[in-house]
Amino acid sequence: MANLEKLVEDLSALTVLEAAELSKMLEEKWGVSAAAPVAVAAAPAAGGGEAAPAGEEQTEFTVVLTAGGDKKINVIKEVRGVRPDLGLKEAKDLVEGAPQNVKENVSKQEAEEIKKKLEEAGASVQIK
């Protein structure tokens, strides 16, 4: 424990330039980057106009579960079919926490297929 406290004291004594150099050295040594990840989706424009400029068609869509409906068990099963990375608890939380994004950055065809499956299971769904 004393070693950690000493390390904290040593790091606290570094100047900004020394801390920046330490950061670069650790990035090189560990093969990582301290850069903040780039946001995937931008917020809609304040004007409320079209999301894409005229002449350009939107190519990536987000499937949003707006309500789980009365048949939540069926909806949870379909969510897990669409998102196999989710466990039962995560899928249940997604359905009960609607509105939630089910899947992001998908093609129009895939978004329509997901919407159809979820609506057949009893959910209310939007594509954005």
From Swiss-Prot:
GO terms for cellular component: cytosolic large ribosomal subunit. It comes from the Bacteria. Pfam families: Ribosomal_L12, Ribosomal_L12_N. Keywords: Ribonucleoprotein, Ribosomal protein. One of its GO terms (biological process) is translation. GO terms for molecular function: mRNA binding; structural constituent of ribosome. Belongs to the bacterial ribosomal protein bL12 family. Forms part of the ribosomal stalk which helps the ribosome interact with GTP-bound translation factors. Is thus essential for accurate translation. Homodimer. Part of the ribosomal stalk of the 50S ribosomal subunit. Forms a multimeric L10(L12)X complex, where L10 forms an elongated spine to which 2 to 4 L12 dimers bind in a sequential fashion. Binds GTP-bound translation factors. This is Large ribosomal subunit protein bL12.
